[in-house]
Amino acid sequence: MENIYIALKTIKKMAGEKNTVFISSKELANEMNVSQQTASRIIISLDRLGYITRTLENRKQKITINDSGLDVLYREYNEISSILRFSQELKLVGAVQDGLGEGKYYISKKGYKDQFIAKLGIDPYPGTLNIKILNEYENNLRRIKNSDGIYITGFKDQQRTFGGVFCHAARIDGIRCFIIFPERSVYRDTFEVISEKYLRKELNLENGAIIEVLASIDGKL
């Protein structure tokens, strides 16, 4: 696993913000100070794990780091930050927007609501505040998504199965709330917030309003 992480870190360093780079196994081997055969095996493993996508363009190997590969790096970053006692509070800034209108349905389900009360200590307003993150705060959002959070267990009712949810402590203008992520979800540039209060009304928010969320990756906020 150590070589996997080092390879991802090396590829990311070479790829930059676009997460894509043309690189041969020989070039990766030189960067990692390993044999070309080892580098080739690592690339195959990264591809098999879904951490990267490999394609050939003009006879050159192009490697793109996938979201799951980035998640590995962000989890490692969170762990190192915790060990070194860096601040565990992160600022998120984004624009309020409409969701799909499903928040009320899910938040009101007894299987979720009972756990919100027991594990989060809140009886949430039946709905979510949807926020589209500004580009310069995407790294912070990814860090939050890849921290442990408080786990809300999935459940079944007579009609269907409901998946687990991770909740992360946050505050908006001093109001206690939680950022929520479905357990099986890919990274998106939007996130949802739940609170005991109807945040749109409490904070007089309209679509497009820029809002600041102070979030925690260790649950202490």
Swiss-Prot record:
Residues 1-89 are annotated as: H-T-H motif-like. FMN binds at residues 185, 192. It comes from the Archaea. It is an enzyme of class 2 (transferase). Its cofactor is Mg(2+). Catalyzes the CTP-dependent phosphorylation of riboflavin (vitamin B2) to form flavin mononucleotide (FMN). Belongs to the archaeal riboflavin kinase family. This is Riboflavin kinase. It comes from Picrophilus torridus (strain ATCC 700027 / DSM 9790 / JCM 10055 / NBRC 100828 / KAW 2/3).
